[in-house]
């Protein structure tokens, strides 16, 4: 996770055959993650310092550190009301909490030099995301 790029597999894409096959993925989102309880305990469970956002990425990174693999299972069925508890998908509150969590995640899983070098880019990307979120709210 050296550059801080976090993305769901197939997010905001139309369903297609490429998502119909079991495949490896970099992380599992918290709303649909499933793992053995002994593995969950071995990696230290969820890090409570991530109250919302990136806790699942952190968990997935630690899971992979012990040599485990993460798979996307297309036959699973999950219904998740995205961002409902935080004011909606494009809320400013969500953006703030998400940005703080991303910086915390990168700080936890990257070395200091990478964090220092990447910080200006991360701030720029965060501001672009804020502008896009504002536009999405405007055009809803």
Sequence positions of predicted segments:
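A residue-level structural signature of the nucleotidyltransferase/glycosyltransferase Rossmann-like core
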Residues: 26, 32, 51, 70-71
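Helix N-cap/coil-helix junction residues
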Residues: 45-46, 68
């Amino acid at each position: 996770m050296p550059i801080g790029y976090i993305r769901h597999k197939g997010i905001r894409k139309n369903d297609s055959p490429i998502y119909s096959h079991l495949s490896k993925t970099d992380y599992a989102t918290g709303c649909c993650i499933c793992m053995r309880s002994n593995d969950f305990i071995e990696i230290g469970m969820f890090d409570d310092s991530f109250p919302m956002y990136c806790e699942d990425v952190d968990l997935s990174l630690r899971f992979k550190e012990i040599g485990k693999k993460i798979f996307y299972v297309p036959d699973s069925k999950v219904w998740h009301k995205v961002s409902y508890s935080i004011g909606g998908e494009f809320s400013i509150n969500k953006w703030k909490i998400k940005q703080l969590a991303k910086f915390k995640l990168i700080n936890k899983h990257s070395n200091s030099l990478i964090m220092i070098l990447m910080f200006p880019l991360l701030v720029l990307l965060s501001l672009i995301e804020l502008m896009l979120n504002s536009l999405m709210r405007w055009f809803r």
